[in-house]
Amino acid sequence: MGAYLSQPNTVKCSGDGVGAPRLPLSYGFSAMQGWRVSMEDAHNCIPELDSETAMFSVYDGHGGEEVALYCAKYLPDIIKDQKAYKEGKLQKALEDAFLAIDAKLTTEEVIKELAQIAGRPTEDEDEKEKVADEDDVDNEEAALLHEEATMTIEELLTRYGQNCHKGPPHSKSGAGTGEEPRSQGLNGEAGPEDSTREAPSQENGPTAKAYTGFSSNSERGTEAGQVGEPGIPTGEAGPSCSSASDKLPRVAKSKFFEDSEDESDEAEEEEEDSEECSEEEDGYSSEEAENEEDEDDTEEAEEDDEEEEEEEMMVPGMEGKEEPGSDSGTTAVVALIRGKQLIVANAGDSRCVVSEAGKALDMSYDHKPEDEVELARIKNAGGKVTMDGRVNGGLNLSRAIGDHFYKRNKNLPPEEQMISALPDIKVLTLTDDHEFMVIACDGIWNVMSSQEVVDFIQSKISQRDENGELRLLSSIVEELLDQCLAPDTSGDGTGCDNMTCIIICFKPRNTAELQPESGKRKLEEVLSTEGAEENGNSDKKKKAKRD
């Protein structure tokens, strides 16, 4: 998936917290950019979504961080706003909320907000830049016209490659000065092959800081887990596109040479006519011409077939227009805890795992295009899965929020598109055998299995520090991230991804640094803080995660 840093960014944004009185749980999280040139993960740690419910989630963005950050900001409220949630039907509420936020990504208002998060210029900004560029070209042409209007004939001839001290060059028509070079002009008229060209911009500005999610309890380290506070620096990746200001000058023709150029063109046409006559005299038959036409028709048909196949295999961005939410998206795994019920919704390949008497119990299913159910839906929607497991040669996920480039079949509902935002739901009744659960992105699960992660945490969760206190859960997560980090980028990409992980213990822990309930920030407060921070941090970089 794109470029890596020369050295991994191992700065971690970590935090710990406790639950509400009715949910005496504890949690710790950490997030690390790693080898990636930007951080595209986000998360939620909300121990009190309402007085009876806690919410924990991880979002793994691809094609940019904007959709993941948008989900972390708005999905909690969208879940609560669902009619099913108010009726206590949490499974239905999660399904409806996933589809609702996915649909919002196609609205003009949300697209503009996503563009701001991603640091991409809006259409208005593009139009202003285009007008400014055209004004610059007009000013350059006016200056050139003024300069050439004051020049002598000898100076003009010298500028355009003519020598006024020699006789006129011979042409086949017996007159004229030949064709002038097309590098510049006298009167500002553009040549047929030389309109101003602009290098296409990928709009990848310099990498900016990214926060990793929203939490509403005590945190430490960089405190980037709190809503809206900038997370770890993502490292300077530098600009990834050519400057749009480096333009070729518009080529203009000189009126002074128009007559000679017309005469030269006539001479060339006469020469072409004579060549055609000589070819016929040399025995070039009409039958041979027909054979060549048949061959041309066959080649054109083959080219048409290739173009159709390429169109089917197009990936976001190939159409020349990039739009957040269309060429970017995110996985989402959301866990709600209410009383003794654990409800987990998942779309994508982030994962939730519960430790049940030391055994890993998967509470989510990784959605991959090559899976039988997913493959059938993709084909029914008109898509293909390549040998390397990519939908139409692009995305290697089969469910995600966003990615509306793959959701354009108007004959099918949202849940039946090539890429669907409809989550799978699993429900578990918690017992004393269930000690903790882990929610993490595939940066963890691509390196370690569910059981390996459970074993790793199990071996450290009872450890105590020098003061006799149990280790903070976030410190265990930090150690897990370091364990998963690859030593270099020479391999297949394993251990080189962004990493975000949350550990939630279903029972309270005796740790000195955890703050009491009174120290907790309300969700509304952190959301308002996020809005203020985001307005001052618009220089973000688009990073492709299609791997």
UniProtKB/Swiss-Prot annotation:
Q: Indicate the segments forming the PPM-type phosphatase domain, all copies.
A: 26-506
Which InterPro entries does this UniProt record tie to the protein?
PP2C, PP2C_BS, PPM-type-like_dom_sf, PPM-type_phosphatase-like_dom
Which residues, renumbered to this chain, carry the PTM N6-acetyllysine?
384
Residue positions of the PTM Omega-N-methylarginine?
22
Report the catalytic activity. Answer: O-phospho-L-seryl-[protein] + H2O = L-seryl-[protein] + phosphate; O-phospho-L-threonyl-[protein] + H2O = L-threonyl-[protein] + phosphate
Q: Where is this region: Disordered?
A: 117-139, 161-329, 513-547
Q: How does it sit in the membrane?
A: Lipid-anchor
Annotated positions binding Mn(2+) 2: 60, 442, 497
Q: Quick one: where's the N-myristoyl glycine lipidation?
A: 2
Q: Where, per the database record, does this protein carry Phosphoserine?
A: 183, 528
Q: Which family does it belong to?
A: Belongs to the PP2C family.
Q: What protein is this chain from?
A: Protein phosphatase 1G
What lineage does the source organism belong to? Eukaryota, Metazoa, Chordata, Craniata, Vertebrata
